[in-house]
UniProtKB/Swiss-Prot annotation:
Signal peptide: none annotated. CDD domains: TOPRIM_recR. It comes from Streptococcus pyogenes serotype M5 (strain Manfredo). It comes from the Bacteria. May play a role in DNA repair. It seems to be involved in an RecBC-independent recombinational process of DNA repair. It may act with RecF and RecO. One of its GO terms (molecular function) is zinc ion binding. Residues 80-175 form the Toprim domain. One of its GO terms (biological process) is DNA repair. InterPro entries: DNA_Rcmb_RecR, Rcmb_RecR, Rcmb_RecR_Znf, TOPRIM_dom, TOPRIM_RecR. This is Recombination protein RecR.
Amino acid sequence: MLYPTPIAKLIDSYSKLPGIGIKTATRLAFYTIGMSNEDVNDFAKNLLAAKRELTYCSICGNLTDDDPCHICTDTSRDQTTILVVEDAKDVSAMEKIQEYRGYYHVLHGLISPMNGMGPDDINLKSLITRLMDGKVSEVIVATNATADGEATSMYISRVLKPAGIKVTRLARGLAVGSDIEYADEVTLLRAIENRTEL
C-alpha cells in the first residue's frame, strides 16, 4: 500500500535506525502522527538538542555534553586501570554495576577484516597515547564475545604487552556472541571480578 509522501518519508527515516525494519518503522511513523503537536515538538527538540549538544570526550571517546567527560575529570577514580569498550552504551552498562572505579576508553568499533575495519579505523591510537604517561598498569578489554571482539582484544594485547602493561579480558560469564550492553549487572560484576590475563 502506498502512503502519503510525509508518512512515507517518516517511515524511511525510522527504518534507517539500527534494528528497525519496515514494519516497526511504519508503526512508529503512525504512532508519531497520532501524538499531540506538543509531544511531537518536544520529541523533535530533544532529538535536535541531543545531536547539537553531545560530543565525544577528547580523552576517552565516551559520549558527553562536557569535554572532557565527568568520568575522565573524576580524580577519585583508579588511575591505574583503563577498561576498553566498543561503544558508549557499554560504558553505561559497566557504570550501572558500580563495581569498576577506573577509567574507560571507547573504541567506536571493532577490528573486523570482513567489514574492512582495521586498527586504524577504530579509536586505538589515542589509547596508546593515554598510556604513555606510565600511570596505567592494567588495561581491561571488555569487547563483546564475538569473533571481531576477540580479534580486537588479541590485537590490543599484542600491541600493549611489549610496553609491560598487563592486559586482561572479561571472564566468560558472557555468552559467546553476546553484547555487553544487554548483560545483567550480576553477569557483568562476575565478568570483571574473574577477568583473565591475555
